[in-house]
Structures are given as structure tokens and as C-alpha cells.
Amino acid sequence: WYIGIILVNLIGLYMSMSMSSCMTLFLTMLIYLMIKGKKKSATALFLFIAIIAFALLSGQIFPRIDTTTDIFRTRIDVWSTALKGIADHALFGMGPSAYQLVWPAYSGYPTFHAHNLFLDTLLNFGVVGGCAIFFYVLTQLKLLMKRFQVNVCKNRNILVLVMFAAVLIHGCTDVTIFWIQTGMLFLLVYTSTGIQNNVKSFAQRKHNMSIH
């Protein structure tokens, strides 16, 4: 089943012609293998990625590679427009989906969002909201690290960490996490951190058991 699901996902990625999604997939797979300590598999995957990247540069497997320059130029235009909006509303931002209000005002490229998770967050919620989100995420990451230390649901923790890495990597060129489907999927996986979430008391009980 897992192999079938992976193949379906790979076919979907190829049909979408999304280079950033493919890059995110390969990088998160590398991160997963490294965390699991599978260095040989990680090395093999790295070599496979290098071969695929070389093949993609020919434009035969991935025709969209020929339009990379135009796509990157469009991204630069979108990011520049977002930065102008951030500069004018730095403190509290302009609310959700703010880019749709910004691009007409600054004659920017017309699209739905800033195509960058970090810029879009600042544009929507400003420095105040961005800092609040940052510190909340930091707190959750600390909890996740503690769960690793006391070996609480390790496989689930790895899944959460890899998905978080995918959000950050793909967030460099898109804001897919804000979509309903992907956002709900991430939250569903993230709820696994609620299993035995009192890490300190769990660690203390484990310590007491080792003493006795």
C-alpha cells in the first residue's frame, strides 16, 4: 500500500509540474532518512536526486524547466510587491489574504498570495502577529525535542518534524499550508503531540522507576 501511495503521489507531482514540490519531497525524504539513521539510504537518495536534477536540466523530463527564468522573474515581482505592503503595514499587517489587496495598489503581479510563507505571514499579520506565531511554533518545537529525549512516540514525532520541514521548505515559494486540505492534514498529524503531552511528568516517572 505504501509503495502504491508513493507512486500515486509521484505521478501527481509530475502532472502538476511543480518543481518546488518535487524539491520539497526529495529534501524531506533526505531529512527523514537522516533522522532514522539510514545513512546508506540517504546517500543513495542523494545520488538519485543528483541524476534526476541533471536529467531535468535537459528539459526533456520536466518541460517546465524551460520556463524557470520567467517563473523566477514572476516570483521576484510578487515578493517585491509583498515587501512594499509589509513596509507600509509593518506592525499589524493587513489581515488574511492581504496580497489580493496589495497587488492592485502597487501595480504588482496579480495572484492570490505572496508565494512565500514568511512574507505572506508578515503581510497578513505584521511583525506583532508574526512574532506571536514564531514564539508559539518555537514552544511546540521545544516540546517536540523533549518528546524525542524521553522517547515518547518517536515515530510520530519524526512524522511531525518531517512535515514541519516540508512546510518550511515549500514555504520558500508557496503558502500551501494555508489551504484547507493541507492545513487540516498538518493539524491532524500535529495532534499526535498531544499523546502523553505531559513530558516533564513522564520523564520524572521514568526517572523514579529507574531509581527503584
Question: Where do the model's predicted regions map?
Answer:
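Hydrophobic transmembrane alpha-helices and their immediate junctions
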Residues: 29, 43, 127-168
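A membrane-periplasm/extracellular boundary helix in multi-pass inner-membrane enzymes
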Residues: 16, 32-72, 80-88, 96
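Long extracytoplasmic/lumenal interhelical loops at the membrane interface
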Residues: 62, 66-80, 84-125
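Transmembrane alpha-helices of multi-pass inner-membrane enzymes
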Residues: 159-212
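Helix-loop-helix junctions and helix-breaking kinks within/between transmembrane helices
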Residues: 2-33, 62, 125-127, 175-177
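Structural signal for the C-terminal ends of transmembrane alpha-helices
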Residues: 30-38, 55-58, 141-149, 191-199
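A conserved mid-to-late transmembrane alpha helix and its immediate loop/hinge
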Residues: 10, 15, 21, 80, ...
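Hydrophobic transmembrane alpha-helices of multi-pass, membrane-embedded glycosylation machinery
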Residues: 6-7, 22-34, 46-51, 138-140, ...
